């Protein structure tokens, strides 16, 4: 019944597209008039649009004309005219939705339409891509259109200094990777002045390969971290012990990706730990004094039994590097958290890095929800439409192709074993290679791609391998995968974002030419060669895409299929499966095995049947549903931290903006003074119960007050009067500091101390939340909801953090001291600038710019500063140097800067 109604009235997607096509006629009707404009007149349209917006017009009022202007600019500058379906894609993006467009339909060009329109507001547009190569490529190619129309373009890639980043973010349109955007957001909220920040307020983002970023990477938080205690020796010892365990000592669930010791395993490991003197002979692993070891044992078990080298990670240059399970790329700078990375390093016998403590973190889910307007584009999103709507409130609209898809998707073939499957794949590759048909073979891991590569090497079939080990060459290799007789093995969707053109990609070949020798002649030669090869490839049947396994997600399979049949080109796709494949073995083996027994599977024979395809699809849907629930659950927990993060970041910004820091100082002074007095002199208590001795000690510890016991000696004195006296004494201490150091210095110092103290307690709070999060699931055994428990305890920890902030801040302010022995009063206001400079330099350390900062960002909260005339310094006596700026030449006479000489270890 439902299918009949769909045929009669069309789907909701069909109706949306039909409505959008009616709007395209308005853009097309403007084209003749726009084409008559001179280059200068076309460029002036940008000024005209901005003026209209200033006078109250909305973006929707100018959308059709703006799109017509961009289309004409693209035609003149790049020789590319937007098709009607591309205009539809642009309207979808402008309206804050996701557009699904097939591979090769020109998504990069589509983004220019909403990017230009929304940049006219002057608030900036972020075009987000998955890697530095695509960000650089798109900003260079599409930037010509924006520049022609008078807009500025910026590009953000890893390793850029802040000055260049700031300029790029201030451009009208900025191309950047999702990683750099997220980390810059975290770094900005660790800086000490608004001028040091690089990002502008959030406005509008267009995410390319939106499914990869918002779905595949949603469970991977961005983390800036610093080292904690060195436990590398313990990881090494536990690793050796775990290697001695038997298969019966633990149970693992590959579906849930969990592993636990059995009763015999616990007994076995306790005896091994006891022999190594790691635990006492009369104690058990789960005794209170040994509980911390459980964490190390569990991570070692996971490292050895749940993670495989060249599948989940690879070892390069003595380092364990994570492989992205969806793209096959190495995730540079990323480390597993909670000690898992250290366990893998112990397993692979490489240097064990220190565990890291989180200093700042955010998930992509919460980062991208900061944008008031968000949109995205991809070739595959409809299968994830419910999740994108539920979590990000983004609707998905599938746009029809410009040319009809002529690609033929063949039925899957299933074999009893991996060897039989590889034999069948090899036979097909040989057949295609002999007639010159290009082949792209998709694998799910580096290990599988290298297995297949070795098979092809034995058969002497020339081929290229594209996986995480050859990341730098991936765009070039994938671009040439459509050439005559080309055989390319690719890990999943490595090279995504680069089109495979039949006959080859001329632009990339031209880029490699030597421009000094016969450049024009060589260009003509390349173009002629590619045109000839394209004819040969089309005659051979176009690109043949072979899948060596089904992925857990149907979307990833669809992406692989979408590599073939670009813009109406011919092509074929086929998946080869075996009962040994992970998806079949873990999720579908029983159901499929029953079907195969019914159909009668024999050695060396393949079965292809619609029933198998349906069973596989159900298995994939089951996994997708499980992964969706995991992402949703992660978001529920991360939302708790996100609410707290927003409060802290907003407060931090307010502190930086504030011109008067005394308000918080005075209110906190009064609050703490009252709290301390009431602690030692409770309301309604007798005088003889007052603890004056400890009151004096506490007031000195917090406020540096020397409390006079005589104040309490009066018979009629009350707690309220003593509180007022204490507050006045604290104010007097502060005033004396202002007189000694100047009010400007004290204002800046108070702000500086408040920020550094806030950073310190927030860092400690994140550490506490990490530990709380790790163990909270165990509350379910006590019939308690882990999420509710986490919310309650996280709130209590947050309140505790705020109390710690107040006390640490007040204590530091009132104990703050500058040695004036060698400092002129008129120079003292410069001392704060030196403190700020030192703070800035500590954050300019190269390690800080990495995803996992290698240096702790803890700040010295006892800034004692003195300056000495350089003439009075004895080069041989460092004690006579006083305070030396880190960028000054070292007083020892070495000729080096102080920070690289005697100051290197400060």
From Swiss-Prot:
Binding site for Zn(2+): 890, 892, 901-902
InterPro entries per UniProt: Helicase_ATP-bd (IPR014001), P-loop_NTPase (IPR027417), SEC_C_motif (IPR004027), SecA (IPR000185), SecA_CS (IPR020937), SecA_DEAD (IPR011115), SecA_motor_DEAD (IPR014018), SecA_preprotein_X-link_dom (IPR011130)
Enzyme class: translocase
Membrane topology: Peripheral membrane protein
Chain residue ranges for the region called Disordered: 862-885
SUPFAM superfamilies per record: Helical scaffold and wing domains of SecA (SSF81886), P-loop containing nucleoside triphosphate hydrolases (SSF52540), Pre-protein crosslinking domain of SecA (SSF81767)
GO biological process: intracellular protein transmembrane transport; protein import; protein targeting; protein transport by the Sec complex
Cofactor: Zn(2+)
Cofactor note: May bind 1 zinc ion per subunit.
E.C. no: 7.4.2.8
PROSITE patterns found in the cross-reference section: SECA, SECA_MOTOR_DEAD
Pfam families registered for this protein in UniProt: P-loop_SecA (PF21090), SEC-C (PF02810), SecA_DEAD (PF07517), SecA_PP_bind (PF01043), SecA_SW (PF07516)
Keywords attached to this entry: ATP-binding, Cell inner membrane, Cell membrane, Cytoplasm, Membrane, Metal-binding, Nucleotide-binding, Protein transport, Translocase, Translocation, Transport, Zinc
Reaction catalyzed: ATP + H2O + cellular proteinSide 1 = ADP + phosphate + cellular proteinSide 2
Family: Belongs to the SecA family.
Subunit structure: Monomer and homodimer. Part of the essential Sec protein translocation apparatus which comprises SecA, SecYEG and auxiliary proteins SecDF-YajC and YidC.
Name of the featured protein: Protein translocase subunit SecA
